[in-house]
Design a protein with these regions (language model features):
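Active-site helix-to-loop segments that bind/position phosphate- or nucleotide-bearing substrates
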Residues: 12-16, 21-227
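Short, acidic/turn-prone active-site loops that include or flank metal/cofactor-
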Residues: 7-11
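Short hydrophobic alpha-helical runs that function as membrane-insertion/retention elements
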Residues: 1-6
């Protein structure tokens, strides 16, 4: 089990978890520390490509076709480990299209509060699965913030962020309390994955396990999630 504590901005600050999530956690941590840089690069890039693609798809779903195409072009030009920061360019187009040209993720408002809260809900699901897989949440693929205890979970969850964005956008005229209630629907709704409709908790479990297997070079297939 995993319990995450948040600060007044609804960002994670601490967590409680068991010492031994699985019987061979020491072996898995040794594997994690030894992950090859080229494999980490390949897996991270595939994950970020899915995030950018999902952002494009969601803008198209909202009939922002021109901006959707702009992000699709960034997707097609993505390079390993994204040296030109296409992920960042995509995010700017995406959020400004959804919430207005004056919107920034640093602003103190109900939209950002809801996004942060929703992302923390997602993060808690992924961090739990990372621990169950026997990995340390602190050691990420590209996320390497020394103050982030959830670097690996932050890396793996990227394609799923548009799930939260969709809920917040659909409720953008409501206050934070109302949006917060809607965000809990992620625990009861089903989503398409591997040709089936599945609960998000089950998708997160399968997705995380497959990413870890790819990093351990036990399975070459990197899973895909599409909104």
């Amino acid at each position: 089990d995993l319990v995450i504590f948040c600060d007044d901005k609804r960002l994670p600050t601490a967590f409680l978890t068991s010492y031994y999530a699985r019987h061979d956690s020491s072996l898995q941590i040794a594997r994690q520390i030894a992950w090859k840089e080229d494999i980490k690069c390949e897996v991270w890039t595939a994950i970020i490509a899915q995030k950018i693609l999902n952002q494009s798809y969601y803008l198209g779903e909202c009939s922002f076709f021109e901006k959707s195409q702009s992000i699709m072009e960034l997707y097609h030009g993505l390079e390993q480990f994204d040296p030109s920061n296409r992920e960042g360019h995509s995010a700017r187009i995406y959020f400004n299209t959804l919430f207005g040209n004056d919107f920034t993720r640093e602003s103190d408002n109900d939209i950002n509060a809801a996004l942060d809260y929703g992302y923390t809900l997602l993060l808690s699901m992924f961090a739990r699965e990372v621990v169950i897989c026997g990995c340390m949440t602190q050691i990420g693929l590209k996320h390497a913030n020394q103050f982030n205890q959830f670097n690996l979970a932050s890396d793996i969850m990227e394609p799923f962020r548009p799930i939260i964005d969709r809920i917040v956008y659909q409720n953008r005229h409501n206050n934070f309390v109302k949006i917060k209630k809607e965000l809990f629907s992620i625990f009861s709704e089903t989503y398409p994955y591997n040709g089936k409709e599945m609960y998000l908790s089950n998708i997160v479990s399968d997705y995380t396990k497959k990413v870890i297997k790819a990093l351990n070079q036990l399975d070459e297939e990197i899973p895909e999630f599409r909104i």
